[in-house]
Amino acid sequence: MRYIDLLIERQKVTERYIKNINKYLQPIKKRAKKILGNGTKVYLFGSFLKGNFGPNSDIDILVVSPKAPIKAGKKSGILLYLKRGFSVYNPFEIHLTTPEIFENWYKKFIKKDIKEI
């Protein structure tokens, strides 16, 4: 398969996800709360929310929980679970963090364009 064919396929899949965004956001939220508990908050942020989403953009989702692991191994297992059943070309970039890191780091970069799911 040529590189251009891969890009075209990725764009088609991304358009399908965007068209039905809530169909995909709700399972992510439900799974996050199931595995990390009811204190978990899920947010949409980044270029998609700002309205300057382009062909190479992703859809940024931030999962904030007191139970969020710090270690990469545990974190990657949760991230895989949150995107279970999605296409390999899915446009979601899921960030998993604790409330402390959210307050002290993410809020420095995310000023106003953030929406709780």
Regions found by a protein language model. Give the residues of each.
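Catalytic core of pol beta-like nucleotidyltransferases
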Residues: 1-43, 49-56, 65-117
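Residue-level detector of short, conserved catalytic/binding motifs and their immediate flanks
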Residues: 59
